[in-house]
Design a protein with these regions (language model features):
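Hydrophobic mid-bilayer segments of alpha-helices in multi-pass membrane transport proteins
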Residues: 43-55, 69-86, 106-115, 260-270, ...
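Juxtamembrane and boundary regions of transmembrane helices in multi-pass small-molecule transporters
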Residues: 172, 191-192, 210-259, 432-485
Length: 485
């Protein structure tokens, strides 16, 4: 199954490369490329919108077809962007744009997800513990606390199977996984650069490592409100389940819990260390050339795989391999481990990363012209765009914008002085509002896919957004009133 999947991905990439190579080459200078990026027509964003519409609608109207032909839909929309882009700006720029997106962003993204998926799949829990409202609140609080220190993806992959297993007997449980995404996969990652990639990028641009702890009061407010709402929802659902005869098959609720495969925590720490190194090594002289550029393997044009990224990839893949080699396959069987979830995410996100390039180009070119000068504006605009685009470049665009406004006090970054309130707003917008959609942050879709595989009926793409509008947006309005006005 994995071999077939890899062949399909390589076929998709090969098709794009062959097209770009076969188009009459119109080599653009770096300056011209930047100018062209600023003039990208809005129509080139249509493939991105089309792919999102497929992700949202086809599982509802043609579920069987969608399951079999996701890779073809991704290839169609990707080529629908690449071909016109190559015709308009030359195959050289098209190939460079696609490679930069795949090597610079997608590769490390999917390798990190793959590593965490493998390691967490080798940790299992068994014992007499049933998912009651109090236990579920405790699990969500534990996962949220871990998110800032092992990353939202790490915490999500570590906690998702135990939460599902404890609530296997429940009939009404989709709300549990939705709040799991809200809290563990997003909001919990706001207290350190390890927590979420935008904060890691901020650290690489001069934001102090522990500065993110300034976000603690904001995070505590969000977590407290959402856990209170969750407890109320879960208690109602729990009582209905019990009234309908649903009961956990355990003799001593809340006791005798056993965790299998605990040695895999070593490999989890190894992956976290790889992520930290990817943020620290580029700033070291040993990894820079005379011009201060990060050293790496040049692939095409200005595209290169940096040595820090290569070290990160090797460390993560080694951790995944060691995890499989040292763990009994019986543990994976207990976890109902399959490759389906990671395959789905890998296929869909390769298309998302490629087709969202025009939107990111327009944002980078026009971001400073939006007239956004107040913290509350930064919070909402950064958050709204992070809900659908990659939150890391979105964060960097608005951090750059804030640094160019000429402030003389605040946090000293390599992009300029950024007032504390402005930086808090940008950080919270990028991290918190990744929870607004399934594609807003890396773990969201993984949690959905694993939940679906385990028989939990998760809401559709638009159905999930409705949950966000009802439960998250009011909390974000409260954030604005309390912290950003």
């Amino acid at each position: 199954m994995m071999k077939t999947f890899v062949k399909k991905i390589l076929l998709l990439l090969g098709s794009a490369a062959v097209f770009c190579a076969g188009t009459p080459l119109q080599v653009l200078a770096a300056e011209a490329g930047g100018e062209a990026a600023g003039m990208v027509p809005l129509a080139l964003c249509i493939p991105f919108a089309g792919l999102l519409l497929c992700i949202a609608a086809l599982p509802l109207v043609r579920a069987e077809w969608w399951e079999k032909h996701q890779i073809h839909a991704v290839a169609f929309w990707s080529l629908l962007f690449i071909i016109p882009f190559a015709v308009m700006y030359g195959s050289g720029m098209a190939l460079e744009t696609v490679l930069e997106c795949l090597v610079g962003d997608y590769l490390t993204f999917i390798v990190l997800l793959f590593g965490l998926f493998c390691v967490s799949g080798n940790i299992a829990m068994e014992g007499d513990l049933a998912g009651s409202p109090r236990i579920n609140v405790g699990l969500l609080l534990l996962g949220t606390s871990l998110s800032s220190w092992i990353g939202t993806t790490g915490a999500s992959m570590l906690m998702v199977r135990p939460v599902i297993k404890m609530n296997y007997w429940r009939r009404r449980k989709s709300h549990i996984m939705i709040f799991f995404i809200f809290l563990i996969s997003n909001i919990g990652g706001s207290l350190s650069p390890i927590g979420d990639p935008p904060l890691l990028m901020g650290f690489m641009r001069g934001v102090p490592f522990f500065w993110s702890l300034h976000l603690l009061p904001i995070m505590v407010l969000n977590v407290a409100v959402l856990l209170f709402v969750f407890y109320w929802l879960d208690r109602r659902a729990y009582r209905k389940d019990i009234a309908e005869g649903c009961k956990p098959d355990i003799s001593k609720p809340g006791t005798e819990v056993k965790i299998l495969g605990l040695h895999n925590l070593i490999f989890l720490v190894m992956i976290v260390a790889a992520v930290i190194l990817s943020g620290v090594l580029p700033g070291m002289a040993a990894f820079q050339d005379e011009a201060g550029q990060v050293l790496g393997i040049r692939l095409y044009g200005e595209v290169k795989l940096s040595y820090p990224a290569l070290i990160e990839i090797v460390m993560i893949l080694l951790a995944a391999w060691l995890s499989f080699k040292t763990t009994n396959s019986e543990i994976r069987r207990k976890n109902h481990f399959t490759w389906g979830a990671i395959e789905e995410v890998a296929v869909l996100f390769i298309g998302i990363f490629i087709t969202m390039q025009p939107a990111l180009m327009i944002l980078k070119a026009k971001g400073a012209q939006l007239g956004i000068t107040e913290p509350y504006q930064m919070f909402w605009v950064t958050g709204a765009l992070s809900s659908f685009l990659d939150n890391t470049p979105t964060y960097l665009v608005f951090l750059t914008t804030a640094g160019s406004l000429g402030f003389t006090s605040g946090i000293a970054t390599t992009l300029g002085q950024v007032p504390v309130a402005m930086l808090e707003a940008i950080s919270c917008g990028a991290v918190f509002m990744g929870a607004n959609t399934y594609i807003g942050n890396a773990p969201n879709f993984m949690v959905k896919s694993i939940s679906d595989e385990n028989g939990i009926r998760m809401p559709s793409f638009f159905g999930y957004i409705l949950w966000s509008l009802i439960f998250l947006v009011p909390v974000f309005l409260l954030d604005m009133l309390v912290f950003f006005l």
